[in-house]
């Protein structure tokens, strides 16, 4: 929901003023400043007044209020313009730039930092580590560049003494992926001299105030600022910047960015070397130049990783090549001092440029492929020195003010001139608004052959000794009649200007008097080749790489380098061309007073800035103009989905007609104008409503696309799955066939083998056939068994079946099953086993057959049995297919007990070689016996007994439980007891004895 400020704070947008006049503009600006509202809109331009105090309007909560909101929805703020530039870049894939302008001390540097902070905060919602790393480095680069490129001036405690333009690269999702920094015209003369009330660059003070005692000792420094000539002027000045704290912040930032420890140490050594250079004093002994404090030379040589004698020679002599001859020309005291200062300035400039290059190497976009990652878009942020008028204005102020003229010209071209020309070109009704075009001042400075820079270059190239006065004379002769140039010679009555020293330029921001003293020297930017060779020969690789031209031979003839002014002019032209290629957003900074006071609003001072920034003309153009314009084709491409007449494609005669239909459908026809090739929208609210409608339709479009795409994916997945299943099915069929064929091949002819294929190894089956293999092996084993059984006589088959049953039940659990001998079964009828009583047993057996009608005798044998009264007796058991009989052989095999087989629930035997067996019955009257044979003795018959009984029960489809355990559990008339087996050496025959838990069967040992 849109939030508007109360009228007590004035008009939030100058476009909403009742009348467009300077008094009303200034009254609104003053009211908002006094109410703590430092930002005001002019349409899509933000006017910012430096509050000279800390305001709590840049926190995370404020960022969230502006994130993704339109300009008119929230009160004026830097975040609003930053978000507008970001949205334009992301929505339309168009490069944008934010140009921050205003004079020195108006708050440009702080504004750029807040804009960077906002962009960093609203990007990378998914918290990708690489994006966070890039954002962190982009933010940290600010404080590093401020330390080495900013200084305290009379107008600003943190004045940028260089120009900075940063491109931030974004991927297709709108997340920062890298950047690039361009720097312009570092004010290196500040290294050696400062005006009263000013300081050198922050880096020197931070090192001395924040460096540890150990570090300063290693650099041969002391904390006293007044000990060093180059910074003595500002040593006692108070600054709002805490140098000691900032030193740690900058050091940490350099580590975060990626500077190596040895690189950071080299930076400190260079700063220390410059401070020591400033303390060098030269004297002349006759014709020989000398250094008064020679120990300092050794310190400088140590810091620069070179030799002291080489440093001394470079400071006192100049090597000159004349043809093939090379001579060392002695310096005068003045020339030596000049060379020392030029060397100090050059070292610092190279250091600063190296820092910028090093940051660029680290933050540049790497491995970005537009075909894979989408278009790489850019937001540029320009923070460059503001317009300056000092008591003494020299070459640096001339370049700085020329830069501001170029930027003002760009503003005029884009906002005032081109916009009005576009309305006329497109046939939009328009009343021309007058404005001051400063192109005449730009031409005065940069015009080929006729401009001040061209005249300065000509003077520098003249043979012989050329003075600054000669340069001024050339200006007078060539520009004397120019309306924006004057000097004492062209305007003799103007006593402000001194003869042979001053000239005045009528800039768009006001008149500035420049002193020509130093123009020639600063433009030539002379540094003797000896110093370049000295630094190139340093053993420190970082220093060596800063001076690549030092490798040139002394006799090598080089092309005359471009002058400082021409280099700066070329860089400004390139900068303006770069900015002109992007969609611009403006922050116009105003300085409320020269006393840095948060309470004072200097009307005259502010009025002057409003006038030269062209803000009133900007208001007039904005009130009469349109907030947005776009070609019909692009407009239709973005918004066609919000009307059924244009979605998905229109059938109207032209895109213009289609756009008209779309606008009428939405009811915005009163807020637009139709040009020849573009549509013009007057208010941002209409554009915002179009965006809302588009966003609503995009949901439906996305759902439709998702439905179609998901359907396509599902069909593709189904086809792939079906194809995969077909492949799997055929592959499995192939594997099955291969397996079957291999089995058939291996087992071919096994019927004719002696072992019927027992030795044949089965092939490894596929997983799907493992159960089939088990079944197949079972079938094969059954077949093989049937083949083996065919060789057995029919009379032996019952015995074989019984042995198989015994094996199934007892194999692996008992040592001897008696499988190797023939099983007779009815041992009581066998004469070898019972020679005296066999004749008596047979009639008894026949009588029982007649009586009980049994069909087969399963087993009979002599046993020793124990009863519940612990009485041990010799008995015999006779097992038929119907009953189990317990007999007394001493009484002619009288039947002592008959147990029907259906009453038998199981057998229990031990796991040893003994013949213990317990017959379990349903009535819990178990029969405990130990089998024994008389001929041969100790013959094992347990396996035979178990086998015939289990086989018989199986034939009747009943199950007989067989337990193999020691001790054996049993029940005598319902009483639980155990029978354990012990082996005794002197035991003649098996015998039972009583113990606490039941019985012990003692069997003879070996």
From Swiss-Prot:
Gene Ontology annotations of biological process type: actin filament organization; actin filament-based movement; early endosome to recycling endosome transport; endocytosis; forebrain development; protein transport
Phenotype upon loss of function: Mutants display no defects in body left-right asymmetry, no obvious motor defects, and normal kidney and liver morphology. Tracheal epithelial cells display aberrant ciliary bending angles and disordered ciliary bending patterns. Likewise, planar cell polarity is disrupted in ependymal epithelial cells.
Location(s), subcellular: Cytoplasm; Perikaryon; Cell projection, Dendrite; Early endosome
Limits of the IQ domain: 699-719, 721-741
Residues noted as binding ATP in the record, renumbered to the chain: 102-109
Residue span, TH1 domain: 812-1005
Keywords: Acetylation, Actin-binding, ATP-binding, Calmodulin-binding, Cell projection, Cytoplasm, Endosome, Motor protein, Myosin, Nucleotide-binding, Phosphoprotein, Protein transport, Repeat, Transport
Start and end residues of each stretch annotated as Interaction with calmodulin: 776-896
Domain text: Binds a calmodulin chain via each of the two IQ domains. IQ domain 1 mediates interaction with calmodulin both in the presence and in the absence of Ca(2+). IQ domain 2 mediates interaction with calmodulin in the presence of Ca(2+).
Job of this protein: Unconventional myosin that functions as actin-based motor protein with ATPase activity. Plays a role in endosomal protein trafficking, and especially in the transfer of cargo proteins from early to recycling endosomes. Required for normal planar cell polarity in ciliated tracheal cells, for normal rotational polarity of cilia, and for coordinated, unidirectional ciliary movement in the trachea. Required for normal, polarized cilia organization in brain ependymal epithelial cells.
Family listed: Belongs to the TRAFAC class myosin-kinesin ATPase superfamily. Myosin family.
Protein name: Unconventional myosin-Id
Lineage: Eukaryota, Metazoa, Chordata, Craniata, Vertebrata
Gene that encodes it: Myo1d
């Amino acid at each position: 929901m849109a939030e508007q400020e109360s009228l007590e704070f004035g008009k939030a947008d100058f476009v909403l003023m009742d009348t467009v006049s300077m008094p009303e503009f200034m009254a609104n600006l003053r009211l908002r400043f006094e109410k703590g509202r430092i930002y005001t809109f002019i349409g899509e331009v933000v006017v910012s007044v430096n509050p000279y105090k800390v305001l709590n309007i840049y926190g995370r909560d404020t960022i969230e209020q502006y994130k993704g909101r339109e300009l008119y929805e929230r009160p004026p703020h830097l975040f609003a313009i930053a978000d507008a530039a970001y949205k334009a870049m992301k929505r339309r894939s168009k490069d944008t730039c934010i140009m921050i302008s205003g004079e020195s001390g108006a708050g440009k540097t702080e504004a750029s930092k807040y804009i960077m902070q906002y962009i960093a905060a609203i990007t990378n919602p998914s918290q990708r580590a690489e994006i966070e790393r890039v954002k962190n480095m982009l933010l940290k680069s600010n404080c590093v560049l401020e330390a080495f490129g900013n200084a305290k001036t009379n107008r600003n405690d943190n004045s940028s003494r260089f120009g900075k333009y940063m491109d931030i690269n974004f991927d297709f999702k709108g997340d920062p992926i890298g950047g690039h920094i361009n720097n312009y015209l570092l004010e290196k003369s500040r290294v050696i001299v400062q005006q009263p009330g000013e300081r050198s660059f922050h880096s020197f003070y931070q090192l001395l105030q924040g460096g540890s005692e150990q570090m300063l000792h290693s650099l041969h420094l002391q904390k006293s600022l007044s000990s060093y000539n180059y910074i003595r002027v500002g040593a006692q000045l108070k600054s709002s910047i805490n140098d000691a704290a900032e030193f740690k912040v900058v050091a940490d930032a350099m580590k975060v960015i990626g500077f190596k420890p040895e690189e950071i140490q080299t930076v400190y050594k260079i700063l220390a070397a410059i401070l020591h250079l400033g303390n060098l004093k030269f004297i002349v002994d006759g014709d020989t130049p000398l250094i008064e404090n020679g120990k300092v030379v050794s310190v400088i040589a140590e810091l620069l990783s070179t030799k002291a004698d080489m440093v001394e020679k470079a400071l006192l002599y100049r090597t000159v090549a004349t043809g093939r001859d090379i001579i060392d020309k002695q310096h005068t005291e003045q020339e030596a001092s000049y060379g020392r200062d030029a060397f100090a300035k050059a070292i610092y400039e190279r250091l600063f440029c190296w820092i910028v290059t090093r940051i660029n190497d680290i933050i540049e976009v790497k491995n970005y492929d537009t075909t894979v990652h989408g278009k790489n878009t850019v937001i540029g942020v320009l923070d460059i020195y503001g317009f300056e008028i000092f008591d003494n204005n020299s070459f640096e102020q001339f370049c700085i003010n020329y830069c501001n003229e170029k930027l003002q010209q760009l503003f005029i071209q884009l906002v005032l001139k081109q916009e009005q020309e576009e309305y006329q070109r497109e046939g939009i009704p328009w009343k021309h608004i007058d404005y001051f075009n400063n192109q005449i001042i730009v031409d005065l400075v940069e015009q080929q052959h006729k401009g001040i820079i061209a005249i300065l270059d000509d003077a520098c190239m003249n043979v012989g000794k050329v003075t600054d006065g000669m340069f001024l004379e050339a200006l007078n002769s060539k520009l004397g009649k120019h309306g924006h140039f004057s000097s004492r010679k062209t305007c003799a009555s103007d006593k402000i200007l001194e003869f042979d020293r001053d000239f005045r330029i009528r800039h768009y921001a006001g008149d500035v008097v420049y002193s020509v003293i130093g123009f020639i020297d600063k433009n030539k930017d002379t540094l003797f080749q000896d110093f370049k060779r000295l630094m190139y020969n340093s053993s420190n690789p970082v220093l060596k790489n800063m001076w690549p031209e030092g490798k040139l031979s002394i006799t090598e003839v080089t092309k005359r380098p471009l002058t400082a002014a021409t280099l700066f002019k070329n860089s400004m032209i390139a900068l303006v061309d770069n900015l002109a290629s992007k969609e611009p957003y403006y922050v116009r900074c105003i300085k409320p007073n020269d006393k840095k006071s948060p309470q004072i609003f200097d009307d005259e001072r502010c009025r002057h800035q409003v006038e030269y920034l062209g803000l009133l003309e900007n208001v007039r153009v904005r009130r009469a103009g349109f907030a947005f314009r776009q070609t019909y084709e692009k407009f239709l491409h973005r918004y066609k989905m919000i009307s059924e007449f244009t979605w998905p494609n229109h059938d109207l005669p032209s895109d213009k007609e289609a756009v008209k239909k779309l606008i009428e459908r939405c009811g915005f026809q009163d807020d637009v104008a139709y040009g020849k090739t573009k549509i013009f929208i007057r208010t941002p609210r209409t554009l915002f409503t179009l965006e809302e409608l588009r966003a609503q339709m995009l949901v439906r479009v996305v759902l439709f696309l998702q439905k179609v795409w998901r359907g396509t994916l599902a069909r593709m997945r189904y086809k792939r799955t079906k194809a995969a299943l077909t492949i799997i099915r055929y592959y499995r069929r192939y594997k099955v066939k291969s397996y079957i064929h291999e089995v058939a091949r291996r087992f071919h002819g096994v019927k004719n083998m002696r072992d019927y294929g027992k030795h044949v190894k089965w092939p490894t089956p596929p997983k799907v056939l493992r159960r089939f293999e088990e079944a197949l092996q079972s079938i094969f084993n059954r077949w093989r068994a049937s083949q083996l059984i065919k060789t057995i006589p029919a009379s032996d088959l019952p015995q074989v079946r019984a042995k198989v049953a015994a094996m199934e039940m007892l194999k692996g659990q008992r040592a001897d099953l008696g499988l190797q001998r023939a099983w007779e079964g009815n041992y009581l009828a066998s004469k070898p086993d019972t020679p005296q009583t066999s004749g008596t047993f047979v009639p008894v057996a026949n009588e029982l057959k007649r009586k009980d009608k049994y069909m087969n005798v399963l087993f009979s044998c002599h046993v020793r049995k124990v009863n519940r009264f612990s009485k041990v007796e010799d008995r015999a058991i006779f097992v038929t297919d119907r009953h189990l009989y317990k007999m007394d052989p001493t009484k002619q095999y009288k039947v002592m007990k008959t147990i029907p087989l259906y009453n038998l629930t199981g057998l229990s035997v031990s796991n040893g070689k003994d013949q213990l067996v317990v017959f379990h019955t349903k009535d819990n009257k178990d029969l405990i016996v130990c089998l024994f044979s008389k001929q041969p003795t100790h013959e094992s018959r347990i396996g035979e007994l178990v086998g015939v009984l289990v086989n018989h029960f199986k034939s009747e489809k009943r199950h007989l439980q067989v337990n193999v355990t020691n001790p054996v559990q049993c029940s005598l008339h319902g009483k639980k007891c155990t029978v354990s087996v012990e082996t005794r050496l002197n035991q003649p025959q098996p015998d039972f004895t009583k113990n606490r838990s039941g019985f012990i069967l003692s069997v003879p040992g070996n």
